[in-house]
């Protein structure tokens, strides 16, 4: 509305969301959300992460039965962390039958653990170094203050203040 009245002044941000990971499934297959109490703690200790992955809800098909990867919560989560080749391999195993959901969950856990290993280590390092964390926050505050000051100045100029 401001831009309509005063000309292009404020930039409306655009979301950058990949279609295949627009919604990350939680433990119950719904979108992952604290509100739904179905969050997978990605930076939790390995044992806790594995325990959460093993709780993902699946259907009651037996090990021998052919499974549909596209309708499986485990596979949907796996797609967020595995490369195309690994996704194709797991999809073929689903369609061939002979693989249980426990095996699929273990494969999913390993993919998540491996993909997030460096990020998890960095997260825990930062969380443990309060002085470094304060420095990051201060830097962010200064950067945000400068950007905000520039925006406020542009707005004031447009409205004549």
Give the positions of each predicted feature.
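Conserved nucleotide- and phosphate/pyrophosphate-binding catalytic cores
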Residues: 1-161
């Amino acid at each position: 509305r401001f831009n309509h009245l005063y000309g292009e002044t404020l930039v409306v941000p655009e979301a950058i969301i990949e279609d295949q990971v627009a919604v990350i499934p939680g433990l119950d297959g719904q979108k992952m959300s604290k509100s739904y109490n179905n969050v997978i703690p990605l930076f939790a200790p390995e044992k806790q992460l594995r325990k959460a992955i093993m709780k993902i809800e699946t259907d009651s098909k037996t090990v021998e039965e052919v499974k549909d990867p596209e309708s499986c919560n485990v596979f949907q989560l796996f797609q967020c962390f595995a490369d195309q080749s690994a996704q194709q391999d797991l999809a073929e195993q689903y369609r061939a039958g002979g693989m249980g959901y426990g095996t699929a969950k273990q494969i999913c856990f390993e993919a998540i653990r491996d993909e997030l290993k460096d990020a998890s280590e960095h997260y825990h390092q930062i969380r443990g170094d309060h002085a470094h964390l304060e420095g990051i926050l201060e830097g962010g505050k200064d950067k945000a203050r400068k950007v905000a000051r520039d925006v406020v100045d542009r707005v004031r100029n447009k409205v004549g203040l």
